[in-house]
């Protein structure tokens, strides 16, 4: 998050503002008590992660499809907000947060040398 994004969450907490535009993957949502309104008009796009692979790569490495399919639907907005919070507010390295999460999900095994 940018400093201005963190400031807007602080302004909400301090009751200086009543409404703000957010991303549902904002790290600050993990620790905030703001109420996120439903986007019933679908004005804002989804920021959910997905995998995209060229067909020629899958033809060359067919085993890749099964590996990548394991990543489907493991990240929802709340999880992304939690992971983003670890990077944005706790100062963890993105690669460390990703590694820990994938290990928790049983998708990555780290072997010691």
Feature map (PLM): residue ranges:
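Ligand-binding "clamshell"
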Residues: 12-17, 28-41
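Short helix-initiation/N-cap motifs at beta->coil->alpha
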Residues: 1-10
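Paired acidic/hydrophobic, glycine-rich loop segments that form the ligand-binding mouth/hinge
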Residues: 17-23
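Short Pro/Gly-enriched coil loops immediately N-terminal to beta-strands
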Residues: 39-49
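Ligand-binding clefts/hinges and TM-proximal coupling segments of bilobed small-molecule sensing domains
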Residues: 63-110
């Amino acid at each position: 998050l940018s400093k201005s994004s963190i400031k807007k969450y602080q302004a909400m907490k301090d009751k200086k503002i009543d409404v703000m535009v957010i991303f549902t993957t904002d790290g600050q949502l993990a620790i905030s008590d703001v109420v996120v309104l439903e986007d019933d008009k679908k004005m804002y796009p989804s920021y959910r992660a997905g995998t995209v692979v060229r067909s020629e790569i899958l033809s060359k490495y067919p085993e890749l499809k099964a590996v990548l399919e394991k990543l489907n639907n493991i990240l929802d907005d709340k999880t992304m907000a939690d992971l983003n919070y670890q990077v944005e507010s706790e100062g963890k390295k993105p690669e460390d947060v990703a590694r820990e999460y994938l290990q928790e999900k049983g998708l990555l095994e780290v072997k010691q040398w």
